[in-house]
Amino acid sequence: GVQTNITVHVADYAQKYADDKILQYINENIAGKNLSDMELMKKIAAYPASFDYGASHSGYVSMIIYGNGDCWASTSTIIRTCELLGIDAWSRNGNKDYGAGSGHMNTMVYYDGKYYELEAGYSGTAPRYYSAEERDSLFCFHDKDDGTLSIYQYDGQLTSGDTLEIPATYQGKTVTEIEDQFSQGSNRTCGTIHLPDTITKIGAFAFSGFEQATSINIPASVKEIGTGAFAQCLSLENFECTGMGNNYASQNGILYSCDKKIAISGPAVNNPQFASGVQQIAEGAFSYNTNLVKIVIPESVTTIEDAAFFDCYSVKNVTIKGTDITFGSNVFYNCSELTLRGTVGSAVETYANENGIAFRDIQEPPKNGLYQEGDSWNYY
C-alpha cells in the first residue's frame, strides 16, 4: 500500500475570527491610506474604541466576539493590531496616572523611531473616547510642591545588559525623588541602575523586583531610602556610594548608614558578613532575600526591626550572639524551617518561644543534623 503523511494544523477559530476582523479593519481604514504617523496611531486606537466598555472581557478575542471589554481588552486589541501591522507594542501600567482607576492599562507603541502612548480604555458605550500621544520621555513624572519632579514609572523596554539611566531633569525641572513602588508597572529587566546627583529620596519598594540588576549607585545627594527599596533584587550586590559626605556606605553587598551602625539593605547576599560595630538591622533590610541560608548576627547588634528577614524562606540557621536584643514584629515571617541559636535565658530564646521558632543554645555542640550550603556541608 501507499503510505501518506498528512500534517494537520489546528487553529483556535475564535482567535482566527478575531484576527480576520482586525485585518478587515486594517484593510478598510489603514492600508494604502498614506497616513501620517500620528494618524496611523489614532486609527489603531480607534478600533477598540468602536466597542462598548464592559468589565467581563479582558482580551482582544473576547472583546471582538462579544462586542465589549475593559481597558485590558482595549490594550490587547491595540497590541494585536500592531502585531498584524508589524509594529512593536507592549502594555503599559496606567493606574498611577492622574485620575486613573485601579488596575488601569494602556499601550506603548514604537514606530518610525518614535514612542507613542495609546489609550482606548475609557468607560462608556461606543464610539468611546480614544487618544494617541507622542512621548518625549519613557519616564513618568509628578510635579512636587517645591517645583521639582518625582519620577514614578518607566515605560520602556530593557534587556539584562542595559542600564536604567534615571534623568536629572525633565522639561527644565530637576528630578529629586524616585517614588514609592516605582518598579510597579516598570520594565525591571536591566543590569545596572544609575541615579543622578539630584536625587534626594528613594521611596519604599522603589526598585523592588529588579531581579537581574547587579549594581546601583547611591549619590551623596540621597538623604532618605524607604523600606524595602531594593527588596527582591536578588542579584544586587554592588552599592556604589559615591561623592563626599555620602549618607550611606556599603560593604560585602550590604548597604549601611554612613557610619555602618545600621544595616539598611542586603537583597542578594547568602551569608551576610556584617560590618564591625553594626548595631541595628533596619526594617525590611533583608526581606524577600531567598538567597539567604545561614546568618550570624554579631554581638554588637541590639535592634532587629520589623520584617528584617520577612519571607526569607530559604534561611535555615540564624545565630544571634547578643543577649539583650529588641525585636520588631514579623522579623522572621515565613521562615518556616528556621532554627535560632542564642544564649539560654536571653531575649533571643524568649523571642523564639513566643513566636514558635525552634531554639538551640549557642553553646551546644554540633549535632548530627547536616545541611548542604553550596559545595560544603554544615552542622545545625
Predicted feature descriptions by range:
Residues 1-5:
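Intrinsically disordered, low-complexity N-terminal segments that are enriched in acidic
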Residues 13-64:
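Secondary-structure boundary elements
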Residues 27, 31, 46-53, 83-87, ...:
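Sec-exported extracytoplasmic/periplasmic mature domains
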Residues 47-105, 110:
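Active-site neighborhood of thiol-dependent amide/isopeptide-bond enzymes
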Residues 95, 99-112, 118, 122-123, ...:
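Extracellular adhesion/carbohydrate-binding repeat motifs centered on closely spaced tryptophans
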Residues 139-147, 159-176, 188-201, 210-224, ...:
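Structural signature of tandem-repeat unit edges
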Residues 155, 184-187, 208-209, 232, ...:
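Glycine/tyrosine- and acidic-biased, solvent-exposed loop/turn segments at the edges of beta-strands
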Residues 181, 203-206, 227-229, 282-285, ...:
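Consensus positions within tandem repeat domains that build extended binding/scaffold surfaces
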